[in-house]
């Protein structure tokens, strides 16, 4: 039997990481939709805080088992990341409340150009013409699928602007911190999850009350709703971990482009489980365009010159690089 090459092994791990993210992301969307629409649990920010609290417990278990090794992340970097991440969560929730669904979807699509800009400015990344065109094709396809009514107001635009930039910065920072401080996905999540859990569980109930005029402590918790909350938190562990793994192995732009496959899958599963309402020709055409764009992007960005860094490297030491290479591969292969 021929030995498996390093490239083949990397491709297999990349595919596994991506499938892990797709399955957990689509799963948590469906569970949260049932929790909020069927059982009336409309406290999205508090629920996210519970997600990170559960993820924190997972990182503590992994630390005890030896999967997470001691590592260092400066407090200023952690604080900056938490600000970006929490503004992203709050901004998305507020944007959805203040904007039409159509403008909310356009705002989400604009994260790809913003992520491209961040990589071009900070990482000196250069994209080929085919890579740029493939990204555009994905945006067109997903836009055709999801964008319907589009109305804009000032406060909604501000909320969307904050949400888009903070989300793009948070995802860029995941990749940046892993490279600069030689942190694998487990290490970084071990640093960030406790801080996000603490801040969101403090801010979340007040923000949710402002958005919904309902108090989280007055919700009618019953066995079924608690089971759904528990299931949502359990799946969120995989969602949070797989996001860090994917962005660490790829880039924020690739994560965003390929991430729209989840949008397509959610639409398809929605039609499958909840009937054919909304399934029409332009939605099907949009799905086909988006998938073709993703295939084109994967091919174009992998070619020489498709996406390359121009003589730029982060200030990591040789010792950090050697330690990160072995530690990251070992831990993420185990995941």
Swiss-Prot record:
InterPro entries from the UniProt entry: Sugar_P_trans_dom (IPR004853), TPT_transporter (IPR050186)
Superkingdom in the source lineage: Eukaryota
Phosphoserine: residues carrying this PTM: 326, 328
One of the record's GO molecular function terms: antiporter activity
Membrane topology: Multi-pass membrane protein
Keywords, in A-Z order: Antiport, Golgi apparatus, Membrane, Phosphoprotein, Sugar transport, Transmembrane, Transmembrane helix, Transport
Keyword Membrane: yes
One GO CC annotation: Golgi apparatus
Gene Ontology biological process terms, A to Z: D-glucose transmembrane transport
Segments for region (Disordered): 303-335
Location(s) in or outside the cell: Golgi apparatus membrane
Transmembrane segments: 11-31, 42-62, 81-101, 102-122, 133-153, 157-177, 186-206, 227-247, 255-275, 278-298
Family as reported in the entry's similarity comment: Belongs to the TPT transporter family. TPT (TC 2.A.7.9) subfamily.
Role of this protein: Nucleotide-sugar transporter that transports UDP-rhamnose or UDP-galactose and UMP in a strict counter-exchange mode.
Name the UniProt record assigns to this protein: UDP-rhamnose/UDP-galactose transporter 6
Classification lineage: Eukaryota, Viridiplantae, Streptophyta, Embryophyta, Tracheophyta
């Amino acid at each position: 039997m021929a030995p498996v090459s390093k490239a083949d092994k990397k491709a297999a791990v990349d595919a596994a990481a991506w499938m892990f993210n797709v399955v957990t992301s689509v799963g948590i969307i469906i569970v949260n939709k049932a929790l909020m629409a069927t059982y009336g649990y409309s406290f999205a920010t508090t629920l996210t805080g519970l997600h990170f609290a559960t993820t924190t417990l997972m990182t503590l278990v992994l630390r005890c088992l030896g999967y997470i090794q001691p590592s260092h992340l400066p407090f200023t970097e952690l604080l900056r990341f938490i600000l970006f991440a929490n503004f992203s969560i709050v901004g998305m929730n507020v944007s959805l409340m203040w904007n039409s669904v159509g403008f909310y979807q356009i705002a989400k699509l604009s994260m790809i150009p913003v992520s491209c800009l961040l990589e071009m400015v900070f990482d000196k990344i250069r994209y080929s013409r085919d890579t740029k065109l493939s990204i555009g094709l994905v945006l067109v396809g997903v836009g055709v699928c999801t964008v319907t009514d589009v109305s804009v107001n000032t406060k909604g635009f501000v909320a969307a602007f904050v949400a888009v930039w903070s989300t793009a910065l948070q995802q860029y920072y995941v990749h940046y911190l892993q490279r600069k401080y030689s942190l694998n996905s487990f290490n970084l999540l071990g640093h960030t999850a406790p801080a996000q859990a603490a801040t969101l569980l403090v801010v979340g109930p007040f923000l949710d009350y402002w958005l919904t005029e309902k108090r989280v402590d007055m919700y009618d918790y019953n066995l079924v709703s608690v089971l759904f909350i528990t299931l949502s938190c359990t799946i969120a562990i995989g969602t949070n971990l797989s996001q860090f793994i994917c962005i660490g192995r790829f880039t924020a732009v690739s994560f965003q482009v390929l991430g729209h496959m989840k949008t397509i899958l959610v639409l398809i599963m929605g039609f499958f489980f909840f009937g054919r309402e909304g399934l029409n020709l332009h939605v099907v055409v949009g799905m086909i365009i988006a998938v073709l764009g993703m295939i084109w992007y994967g091919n174009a960005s992998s070619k020489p010159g498709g996406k390359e860094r121009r003589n730029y490297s982060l200030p990591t030491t040789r010792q950090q690089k050697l330690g990160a290479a072995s530690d990251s591969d070992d831990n993420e292969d185990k995941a």
